Amino acid sequence: MKVAYWGNCRKSGVTCALTAIGLTAVLTYPFKITIFENHYSENGVLRYLFPRKWPYCVAEPVHHYREGFFHENQHRMQNAGSMADYPVIELLEKGLYYVPQFTKNADLFDYQFHCNLMPVLKRYSEIAFIDTQRGNALSSKMILEEADVVVVLLKQDMYEIQSFFQNYSSLIPRAFFIISDYQRKSKNNLAKIISEFGFRKDCIGVIPHSEEFQFAAGYGRMIEYISTNYVGKGTREDYYFMQELKKTTFLLMQKVAFDRRLGEVF
């Protein structure tokens, strides 16, 4: 089951949402989820999971990986046939995994992902969350076309939402929508958005604005924040944030794992 996370505008919160939902899903359900990124970014998934002062802290939980793996063994990639041929970081034990970026050269990463990881991803039978670049990445169009579910990150802005419907209507049948950095006191609240655009309530969720969450994520402590607040031990705002994150995760995973017969969103 391939789940592409994508946004139709800049700074829509794709990577942060993918990471938060991946963590919440494996804490809630007995799933195995592997995270992929189809583009190089210094602000990728690991930014939210590990403090920046510990750049090599992921060394111990890495499987099939050592420093320089891809540079030394790129010839193996041409003949690789499964995920066993690629490095995988175990983020949460027996639940959440991550395929790390293997070069800081954005063009090389784009090319290698398209040529070598896309064939593996096509055959991948478990749940894959894919941070999908908007724009001209070689693999982005293919990922969006072949994904079982496309998680569309939207800003809480009526113009931006309208822009999605005008320009990307082909994604609607497989889409699950998330309003990122959601402000519940905004005049453009979820009820108004649903009414204005006709969303089905089971196909849209929110990730609320939270200073504490943003602070934790910015310092690489998202795992700690979500794990600590998962059982509701934080402040009232923390509780509200986690309840909405859990609800959004539940709605998405219903579509991903429990409803294999993907129907029309509208």
Question: What does each of the following model-derived ranges do?
Answer:
Residues 35-120:
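P-loop/Walker-type NTP enzyme "switch/lid" segment
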Residues 2-48, 114-117, 121:
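Walker A/P-loop phosphate-binding motif and the immediately C-terminal alpha-helix
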Residues 223-266:
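NTP-binding/hydrolysis catalytic cores, primarily Walker-type P-loop NTPases
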Residues 94-96, 122-130, 149:
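Loop/turn-to-beta-strand initiation segments
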Residues 137-157:
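Inter-motif core of Ras-like GTPase G domains
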Residues 106-115, 164-187:
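P-loop/Walker A phosphate-binding loop and immediately adjacent motor/lid segment at beta-alpha junctions
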Residues 5-6, 36, 100-101, 129-131, ...:
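Conserved beta-strand segments of the P-loop GTPase G domain that flank and frequently precede/overlap
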